[in-house]
Amino acid sequence: MLRPDDPVYILLATYNGERFLPAQIDSLLAQDDPDWLLLVRDDGSTDGSLQILSQAARSDRRVRILRSGTERLGSTGSFFELMQQAMSEGARYFALCDQDDVWLPQKLSLMRLAMQDL
């Protein structure tokens, strides 16, 4: 059962997503359920992705960039590393998002309601 104090770990793997990330991050910040943490792993972007992510992390303490070396892992490897990090922090619930997603404001609150019924 999802407890009220359990944050949802949002896992975001990025690669050259500069044109998508501002809208994605804005949609996460606009969630009506504020109890979340965003873990991001960039897979060696050569555009402005890291600058956008760094600004988001400076602006909101719930946003964290996972620094895990320079090896390119692809999306599967990046999500695996993000899950490992989240589990090492005691995460019980995850939400995966792609860099080109835009979430509706109720996404996490509706997910939390559905999880309480399980």
Predicted regions and their residues:
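Nucleotide-sugar donor-binding/catalytic module of glycosyltransferases
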Residues: M1-L118
